[in-house]
Amino acid sequence: MKTIMMSCMMDGFPIEEIVSTAVACGMDGIDWVDLHGHTAAELKKFCRDAGLPITAHTGCKEGFLHRAPNAVEEFKTMLDDAVTLEAPVLMIPPFPRDGQRSLAEERKEYTEYYAEITPLAQAAGVTLTLESTGYGTSSIVGAQECLEVLRQVPGLRVTFDPGNVATLEDPLLAYCALKEYIVYLHFKDWQFSSVPAPGFAPVRSGKFVKDTLIGTGEMPLCELWSQMEARHKALPVNLETRDFEGKRSPMELYRKLVPEMKKW
C-alpha cells in the first residue's frame, strides 16, 4: 500500500514537521490539502529537499460553495498551485453549497461546474477528481450519483473514499460500479450510531457518524482492500486519520499505523 500523508490531518503543525513526520514514518508521499499559509513553491521545495513525492493537491477555496461569480477564476488559482506542486491529481470535493434547493439540482450545478473546469485541468496536464462527500446534505455520495456527473464530464475521475460512500451505501458495491474512474484513494474510519449522540454527525443514510482512528471503528477497510483490483492497490492512499482524542502525537500514531497498513 502506498500510504500518503493527508496534510490536513496535521493542521496547525509547521509544514516542516508535517513533512518530516511523513518521511520518518515511511509514508510514500503527501497530499497538500490547501497550502497551510505558504506558497505552492515553498511546499514543493520542502518536499523536494526531503525526498517526499507530492501525490495530489486538494483545493479548499470555497467560492463555488458560496456561489461567488469568480468561482472559475478561483479554480484557476488552485490549478496553478497544483501545477507548481507538480501534483498529478487535483481534487475538488463537491461539498454542499449555500442555498441548496435540492440534491438533484445541486448535482446539476456541480456537473456544469466540473464540465467547465475539467478541460482546464486537462490542458495543464493535471487529472481532476471528485469524491463522495459524507455530509447530511451532500448531493454526490452514492455510486449512481457520482456516475450521473462523470458520464457527462469526459476526463473527470474519482478519488474513492469508502468511508464517505458508507454514509449512504455499501462501499464495495460502489467500488465495483466506479472502478473504471478511480485514480486515487482516501481511507478513514467511522463509528456509527442509529440515534443522535454527542460528537456524531447526521449523514444521508439516516445514521450518525463520528471520526475515529483507522482500525478502531466500524469500516471494513482491510476487507475492502483485499477485494480491490491490483491496479487500484497500486494507487496512492491518503490516510485520512489521526488521534481524534489528542492522546498521541502524529509521529507516535503514524509510526505504528503505517507499517500495519502496508501489510494489508
What residue ranges belong to the model's regions?
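Residue-level detector of anion-binding/catalytic polar loops
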Residues: D28-G29, P53, P88, T127, ...
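Glycine-rich, proline-tolerant flexible connector loops at the mouths of alpha/beta enzymes
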Residues: D31-R48, R97-S102
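Alpha-helix-loop-beta-strand connector modules within alpha/beta enzyme cores
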Residues: K44-E62, T111-A121, L147-V153, M219-C222, ...
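Conserved beta-strand positions in the central sheet of alpha/beta enzyme cores
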Residues: D31, A56, M91, T129, ...
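Active-site acidic/histidine proton-transfer and metal-coordination neighborhood
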Residues: R67-F160, T167, M251-E252, E260
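Active-site beta-loop-alpha junctions enriched in small/polar residues
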Residues: M6-M10, V33-L35, G59-G63, F95-R97, ...
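Histidine-acidic metal/acid-base catalytic patches
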Residues: M1-T3, S7-V23, R48, E86-A87, ...
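Active-site mouth loops of central-metabolism enzymes
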Residues: M1-F13, K61-V72, Q100-E106
